[in-house]
Amino acid sequence: MEISGFMKHPWIGRRVLKTGLAVCLTTAICMAFNLSPTFAVISAIVTTEPTAADSLKKGLIRLPAAALGAFFAVLSAYFFGQTPITYAIVSMITIAVCARLRLDAGTLVATLTAVAMIPSTTDHLFADYVSRVAGTSLGIMISTFVNFMILPPKFGPILMNKVEKMFAMLSSELKLVTTKVVDFEKEETMTSYRTLHHHLSETYKLTTFQHDEWKYRKSSSSEKRSFTYLHRKLDYVYKALAHLGKIGQIRLKKPLSVKERQLVLSFLVSLTNILQDPLHQIHTEHYALARQLEDAMHKKKDATEPIHRLLSELISLHDLTVELEQCTADERRFSLEERAYPSYIFLERLRPSD
């Protein structure tokens, strides 16, 4: 199996491979220095992060947190022995102190370390403490090192795929919600709208992850520009969702005329096709439909009338789409002139299938 194909396997990704490598290295080093690998392995597993930035930042928090957890475990085991109350006290104190000292990122590893230490505590308290802290610290450091140096995350293709899915979901939801409004259907239309908002928030997080990565890794100006473009596309989805939400709240007082209904539905089909097109190209027929919508809206004198509001929101979506087309055309032109521009943005999606 080729490495590239293996990396794309749906259930084994970079983070899983890095976790396995961190566990293997941690165990080997622990055995070489006659340290118990249990605590080190637990730490290595729970401290693998999606970005190198997170690994470094949280690693500095987890080290003192783990030391605190081990200290509380040794102390509690000495006074109370291995009893249920000991586990409860250690867990509560560790969580409370980590929260008090703002070591939230280290709470999990500190609590796991503390609880796992209790059964193996002996009369040699100091030796136990040093051994467990050494193992836990080793696991955290190895995990951080592997996360930073091995298989750095590639958020570009992931973000591009998610942006494409967002546009497909947006076009589908837009057609569904508007059609229900036009056809006087009173079913709940906002559930999938909220799901869209959730997916959008999760996709925005990927851009944050990439910006964090750039603090520690070099990147080309073309790569940064492509991320700016993808971020602008997400901003378009965000604005479009605002209009979609308003459309979903509209309740028509009377049915549209046959002509108006046909116009709205034709415009919807055209708009959704544009949203799903990788280049978001707008054809002459769509501009003609948009002008007809504007004419129909201007004939409605009362701006508070539901039909006026519906047409106004659709026209606003059209205006946004015009901006999107121009933005995409400019970026496409730049990608053709710049060889270093990432191919996953346009080239791989516009390449004809075999």
Swiss-Prot record:
It comes from the Bacteria. Its main location: membrane. GO terms for cellular component: plasma membrane. Pfam families: ArAE_1. InterPro entries: ArAE_1 (IPR010343). The chain crosses the membrane at residues 22-42, 60-80, 107-127, 133-153. It is a multi-pass membrane protein. Keywords: Cell membrane, Membrane, Transmembrane, Transmembrane helix. It is found in: Cell membrane. This is UPF0421 protein BH2644. It comes from Halalkalibacterium halodurans (strain ATCC BAA-125 / DSM 18197 / FERM 7344 / JCM 9153 / C-125).
